[in-house]
Amino acid sequence: MKVLGFRAFLAGLCLAAVSATAQAQSNPLYVPLGPAKAVLYKPDSGPAPHIGIVVMHRVANYLSHIACTEFSKRGFVVLCMNSRFDNNEVRVVWEQIALDVKAGVEYLKRQPGITKIVLFGHSGGAPTMSFYQAVAENGVAFCQDPKRLTTCDNNLAGLPKADGIVFADAHPGFPMTILRGFNPSILDENDPGKVDASLDPFDPKNGYNPKGASNYSPEFQKRYFEAQSARMNRIIDRALALREKMKRGEHYYKDNDIVIISRGGNPVGGPGGVASLHVLQPSLESIMSTARPQKLIKNDGSIVTEVISSVAVPDPGTRETNMSFDVGTKVYSVVSFLSNNAVRSTNSLDGIDHCTSNNSTVCAVQSITVPELYLAMGAANFIRDTEMTFDLAKSSDKDFAVIEGALHPFTPCRPCEKTPGQYSNTVKNLFDYATNWINARF
C-alpha cells in the first residue's frame, strides 16, 4: 500500500510538472533499488519498446526529470533514478554511485522486450554515466589507476555494459566546473575577507561590470585561470594531508572531517555563487564558443554548420552570492571533496589533468567504445567543453550538435531572445534529435 501511495504521489507530481506530455506517461511506477530510488516510465500506447534509457545524476533529484516524460512519450522505457547520495553533497563517495547505475541497468534488462540500454547523462549525470561505462568496458583497472586522487573498490568489477550514451549539456567533470567557479583572490582559507585585489573578479579595475557583461583582459584571464588552479591544488594538498593523518590515527576523527571552501560557489552545485569569468563575460570564446564549425539545430528544426557561440546573458549578480554562506560556500567532507570535487591542474582553462579524478567525462570517454551523442545547449556554458570531450572520445560512432537558444535544463532562454518565441522549440528539438539518433542505431 505504501508503494501504491507513493506511485500516486509521483504520478501527480509528474502530471503537474509536465502536463503537456503527461498523456504518454500516466502511470509511472516507483521502484526501490537498494539504496537508490527509481521511477519507471512507459509509453501508454504504441509498439512494445525494446530500448530502455537510464537517467541519473550524482546527487540531484531526477525522478521527474524532463527526459523521463519526453523520452517515454517517444516510445522508450525510461528509468529515472536518484543515487544513494541524493541531495547530499557532503556524503558523496563518487565511485559508489556506479553501483546504483548498475542496479538500474540490470533492472531494465529484466523488463520484457528490452534488448538495448542507453545511458542519458545530463549535467552531472554525464560523468556519472561515462564513469560507469568506462569501468564496464575496461574493468576496475580504469578506476584504480594510481594517478587518481581516489580509487574504486573491486565491487565495481563486472558491471553490465550499456549499448550507447547520450550526453546533454554534459559537465566535463564536476571537479572541473568547481575549479572554474572558484574565486582565486582568497588569501586565507580561514578568512575569506582577505583578498588579493589584483585577482578580484568583482573589481571594476579588473574588468567587472556590475550592470552587464564584464570585459577581462587576456592578461587578467591568464593570471586568473592559473590562480584558480593554485587555490584548488592547495585545498587538495590540505585534504590529502588530513586523510593521511586519519589513516595514521593522528587526527581526532578517524574516518572523515569537514572541508569548507568559502567563495567557492553554490553548495548544492546549482547556479549562483560562482566566480566563473565566463558567467560574467559570456563572450569568452575560449569557453563559450566552438573552435570550428559544428552543427547548430535551429529553432525550426533545420540544421546549419557554423562556428557557434553561446547566446547566454551575463550574471553580474554573482558578486553578492559569491560572498554569501548559503549560496557561495562549498561544504564537503574530506572524502566527498577528494572523490567528487577535486582535480589537479596548472590552469583552469586548458591545463587540467582530467584523469586525476574518476569524476571526469573527459577522461572516461577516452576509454569508451559504444556510440555516443553529444548535445550542448546554445544558451549555456558547456559548448566548448562538449566539443572538446567529443573530440577526445574514443568511440568511432559519435555525433555532436548544439541546440539553439537552450538553457542548461533544456528550456528556452527567454532573456536571450531578440524576438518573442525565438527559441521556443528547444525541448522538442533536443528530444527529437536524440530519439532519431537512438532509433537509427538500436
Q: Across the structure, where does each feature detected by a protein language model lie?
A:
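N-terminal cap/lid segment of alpha/beta-hydrolase-fold proteins
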Residues: 24-48, 346, 419-425
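Primarily recognizes the serine-hydrolase "nucleophile elbow" in alpha/beta-hydrolase
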Residues: 110, 116-190, 347
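Short beta-strand/loop motif that positions the catalytic acidic residue
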Residues: 368, 373-376
